[in-house]
Structure formats: structure tokens, C-alpha cells
């Protein structure tokens, strides 16, 4: 998802008066603007995906706290917010696809350690997989 795509969605959310989408997009656009200032230039698409993932993680944590505090109003609000944020992310790889990708990387690079496999996986499929699952699968394949 590019910055211009996000801004177009933001404009559409303003026009349709969709408060949750607007709130989520404003948070992401603000994070992108801060990163742009930090980088002193445009933010690459890979970094935008990472920023959206951070927002998703933050929203999940807030949702967990709301559930622990039994705050029904906040739970509903953050579930909607989380759904909007997750819709901005690229499609996640299934466990089978991830397994195939790791096998291909091991075959191509001949890697025997976890580090090189995870590095190659990150370069090729950044933001499209769960790191814990990938790490567990890679360990399993390398020790087998």
C-alpha cells in the first residue's frame, strides 16, 4: 500500500463520514509523516507496511487491555479499528506457503543456520508472514 493510496482512502472515508476508517487512516498517515520527517524523504512501501503492522500490534494490545478491564464499549471500538488496519496490510502467507518459501530459500542458499534463512525470507516476503511461525518452521526444517 502506497502513501498516495492511503491518502485516497482517507479522502473517501472523509466523504463517507466513516469515523472508524478515518481514525485508523489518520493514525497511519501521521506515522508515515513522522517517518518521512525522520528519513528526510519519501517513505518506502516496505516501511509503510511495517508502520501499519506497528499500528495493528498497538491496537491488539489496547484491545487486550480493554478485554481484561471488561470495557465493552472500548472492545467493540478497537475491534472495528483493528479490522480497518488489517485491511490495509498485504495478504498474509498461509503456513503452507510459508513452508514452501522457507524450503525454497534453504535449497537456493544452502543455509544451515536460522539467521540467513530469516534474512532472506524478510527480504523477499517482508510484512506478509508471522515472524514467530516462520522462525518455528525454519528451525524445524533446519534440524530435520
Q: What function would you assign to each model-found segment?
A:
Residues 1-144:
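Charged, compositionally biased, marginally structured helical/coil segments
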